[in-house]
Structure formats: C-alpha cells, structure tokens
From Swiss-Prot:
Gene3D superfamilies attached to this UniProt entry: 2.30.30.30
Organismal lineage: Eukaryota, Fungi, Dikarya, Ascomycota, Taphrinomycotina
Subcellular location: Cytoplasm; Nucleus; Nucleus, Nucleolus
Pfam families assigned to the protein according to its UniProt record, in alphabetical order: Ribosomal_L6e
Matches recorded under InterPro entries: 60S_ribosomal_eL6 (IPR000915), Rib_uL2_dom2 (IPR014722), Ribosomal_eL6_CS (IPR049633), Ribosomal_eL6_KOW (IPR041997), Translation_prot_SH3-like_sf (IPR008991)
Entry protein name: Large ribosomal subunit protein eL6
Keywords associated with the record: Cytoplasm, Nucleus, Phosphoprotein, Ribonucleoprotein, Ribosomal protein
Designated gene of the protein: rpl6
Length: 195
C-alpha cells in the first residue's frame, strides 16, 4: 500500500492506494469463465484378489466364453491371463478383467512349466488396419476377408496346452470339470453356493 495526497478539506488529506498490479479489475467478463475442478482422485494400480493366483480354476461370468471354466496363467497389471486350455473346452489364451471371474475352491493346477513372459499387453493388442476403409463398401461387402489368427498365436496356444494337459490329467476328474460349463437354473441361489 502507498499513500497518495488528496485535495479537498473534507477528504482527509491523504489516501491509501493499492499498487497498480494489485488493484481490482475495472472490467469483469459478462459470463463467468468455468474453472475446472481439481481432481481429487488418483489413478492407482488395480489390486487383484489373492484368490486369483496362477493355477486357480475360475468361472468366467461375461463375454463370449461366459460359463466356461478356465485356468489362470498369470496376472498382468490390471487383468488376468487365462486359458481353457483350448484342447479341453475351446477357450484360447485371453485377457480377462478380474471382476468378471469367480475363483473356485478346486485344486490348483501346476502352471510352473508354462512360460508366460510373452503374454503382455502388447501381445494382446489389436493390429491396426492398413489404409482407409470406406464404411459403405465395408458394410455391404459379402465376401469380405476375415482377420486370420496369426500363426504365432496358434503355436503359443499349442505350447501352453502341451504343458497344461499333463498337469490337468494328474488331478482326478479335473479334465471333465474344466470341460463342463457352469450355469444357473431356477431355484439356484448363487449367494449360498460354495464355488
């Protein structure tokens, strides 16, 4: 604050004045500008359940393979890597959100022989299409080429199945258990079931 002399007998002689930078604005906008709220949420890594350890038999609750029993191979940062195995119930190696899975109390399958280092986010990423695709032509195309599964994925599936099948056969009735689908019928109470 600085003092400025003021003329006039009734004005007190001097007045305290703010510096130019701190003075109140002479112009106010007609519309108030929206100030974004400060985000109070932090992005934290997903905490996967302790029951979803590698080798656990789980039931898928959603998606194309809902009702199928699968074996957990590994945990990524936010998802699980599971397989049927494909030879037993047709479920390939895929990523699954842990919220859509029920861990069962079935005996764990030994997956120590399966190498899971290559199953990362990049491994499951979709391949980008090359060149622009016109919507009308793609919609009405009858003999459109289907995306073929890479030979690498097929070889990986066969390698995983070859390691898992002996471990599954070592546990009595496990192969039949994995091959059978899970479903609810009238009168079933899932909240009272022990999986």
């Amino acid at each position: 604050m600085s003092t400025v002399k003021v003329n006039g007998a009734k004005n007190g002689g001097e007045r305290m004045v703010l510096p130019a930078g701190e003075a109140a604005a002479k112009y106010y906008p007609a519309y108030r500008e929206n100030v974004p709220k400060k985000a109070r949420k932090a992005v934290r890594p997903t905490k996967l359940r302790a029951s979803l350890a590698p080798g656990t038999v789980c039931i898928l609750l959603a998606g194309r393979f809902r009702g199928k029993r699968v074996v957990v191979l590994s945990q990524l940062e936010d998802t699980l890597v599971v397989t049927g195995p494909y030879k037993v119930n047709g479920v390939p190696i895929r990523r699954v959100n842990h919220r859509y899975v029920i861990a069962t109390s079935a005996p764990k399958i030994d997956v120590s022989g399966v190498s899971v280092e290559k199953f990362t986010k990049a491994y499951f990423a979709k391949q980008k299409r090359s060149g622009p695709v016109k919507k009308d032509e793609a919609f009405f195309a009858e003999n459109a080429p289907k995306n073929a599964l890479p030979a690498e994925r097929i070889a990986d599936q066969k390698a995983v199945d070859a390691k898992l099948l002996p471990a599954i056969k070592a546990i009595p009735n496990m192969k039949e258990y994995l091959a059978a689908s899970f479903a609810l019928s009238n009168g079933d109470r899932p909240h009272l079931m022990k999986f």
